[in-house]
Structure formats: C-alpha cells, structure tokens
Amino acid sequence: MQALLVGGMLGPVGLRAASAPSGHTLVLGTQPLGMPCSAISALIQRDQVLQQTLARTQWRLSHRPFGKGSDMLPLLSLRQLSAAFLGDMPTLVAAALGEAAIVGLVKQTSTAIVGRGLERIEDLRDKRVGYVEASSAHYTLLQALNLAGLQESQITLVPLAVDQMVEALERNDIDAFAAWEPASSLALMRHRAHRVIFRGSTTDYLVINHFFTQEHPEISLALIASFVRAIQWMRLSRLNLDKAVRWANDEATSFSGRALALPLRQLTAIVERDLLDVPAAPWVSPPDAQSPLRQEFEFLARLGKLPSQARWGQVERAFGYDGLSKVLTQSRQYQTHVFNYRE
C-alpha cells in the first residue's frame, strides 16, 4: 500500500543504464537502536521512489543493522558497506583515514552520562561505567573525565550494548552509563534515583564510502535524495512522523528482539528535537579551526583514540563532498518532494 504520493509522477532522475553492472547492491549500514537515525533508515528502506530509481539500472538496496557505529568502520573501509549512519567519533575516524564522504546531519543533540545515586562527574571515580567503545557517548565520557581531572584507568569500563544499559543500571551491575537516546530518557523515566550527571554535544551523519561516490556518483545521489525525502516527509505532518517512528520501532524489535521501551510520544519528541527542529538540517557547514568537531579531533588525537595516520585535512575533504548540495539544488530531477513508502 502506498502511504503517500505527492509532487508528480515517478520519472527518471538522471541515472544512465550503463552506470552499473547487473546485480549491484547499495548496502546501507543502520543503527536500529538509535533515534532519530533509525526513523530515517526505516523510511529509506521503504522508499519506493528509491527502489524504482535503482531498479532502472539493475541496482537494489540492502541494509545491515548494527548495534554501534564502530562495528561498521571495517566494513566501510573494505567497501562491504556503501554507506552508513555514524556518530561523530566513528565519522571522524572514517573521514580522517580518507574513506568517507560526509553527506549531511542526522542528529544534533547531546549524549548523557546517567548515574544512580551520583551527583557529580567526580563521583565516577572507582565506579563501574557502561559504555560503547569508540562511540559518540564514549567521547562524552572522555570529555567528562577530562573535566573532572580523571583518567579512564580510574573508573571500571564495562562494555555494553546500548539497549542493555538501563537494565544493567537497575540491577546494580553498573553505577553509571554513557549513552545516546533513547537510553538516557528511558533511564530517567524508570527510576527517580537515576539522574544525568553530564551532557556532551554530539552529532550523527550519513556517510558514504568515498570511493563509492567516485565510482557510482548517481547511485550515491539517489541515496541522498531518499535521505532528503525521509526528512521532508516527517516534517510534513505529525501523522508521517508517528508512522516513521513506529516503523523504526519495528526495526528495533527485529534487531534486538524487543521494542524500544519509550512511549511513542517520547520517541517522536526525540526525532523532532534532535533533527526536525534543527535549523537547516540536514545541511551541515564544513568545520573550521574553531569548530567543536575540530576540537574533538584534537582531543581524541591527544588521547591516542584516533589511528596514527588520521589527518584533519582528510576530514575537511570529507565535508567538502557536494552530493547534498546537488540534490537540493536539483530537487525536481531527484524527486525530493515525491513520497511513496511501502507499508
């Protein structure tokens, strides 16, 4: 069933029949347990405009779900993933190695350190802290420790999947955790003793393999057009947003065996706050020398959290990719206002 179709008839968007051999697959890495990127990826997977565009040149879309962005980096490097939704720390790693073209903003918000019975960052000393290695929340934890004059060696790091953290805190298996939404909101809802002791700003991005954009430029633009459509469609009405969040919840259930525990209204509020209400999103300005992302790069490099061959110039090049600009300035050609989502 078609969810919605506006803006005209489906037609060609510039793909040429010779642009790819038969049977090629555009493989998208997704994170079903994170909002709002899971809502976007759920829409991209159901986007019939994208499916028809790809089919004209014998391409198809496939998705691979992951619990954390750092698990996607080796596959993105090996080109087993064409594109991925990544937090800022994995994005920096991929970009600094020259392997990424950064398309646009997926999330602008904060990640949180949530503790049970803790008041300050300094209270983390000698405590067990749940975290996801090389994630945006890991960077937030490193920031917090640095501000408190603590080292990672002065806490006990407990690697956990993001959907395990709230229950681990409730069972007293850990004393605190660093995570992204919806984990932090869920923890606050579940127990009055849970409180946020630190927040750090964070961003997520849609990233395409750099070499993929060079070898298959129009396929890359077709994916970007679907990305833009997803955000436009959610902005059109609350009904659309609710549907996208329900589909995202279905993806989370399929991936982890259980639905996201927050009520629908809170999940939609996260998508609105972290993406739809962000001015100009998904557009993102290239970072300059004073940007938070440059500061993050320098901070992680000092701590030895980036590969030795990582270079800031590669990050600047990654942000220089003009795919989003092309799609937005040629919106009619790329059908960014044509919506057709499979139920």
What role is predicted for each listed range?
Residues 46, 69-72, 87-90, 137-140, ...:
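Stable alpha-helical elements in mature extracytoplasmic
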Residues 158, 163-259:
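Pocket-lining segment of extracytoplasmic ligand-binding domains
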Residues 62, 262-274, 311-326:
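Short linear loop/turn motifs
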Residues 1-18:
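N-terminal export signals
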Residues 293-343:
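Conserved C-terminal helix/tail region of periplasmic/extracytoplasmic solute-binding proteins
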Residues 131-139, 163, 214-221, 287-291:
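Soluble non-cytosolic domains of exported or imported proteins
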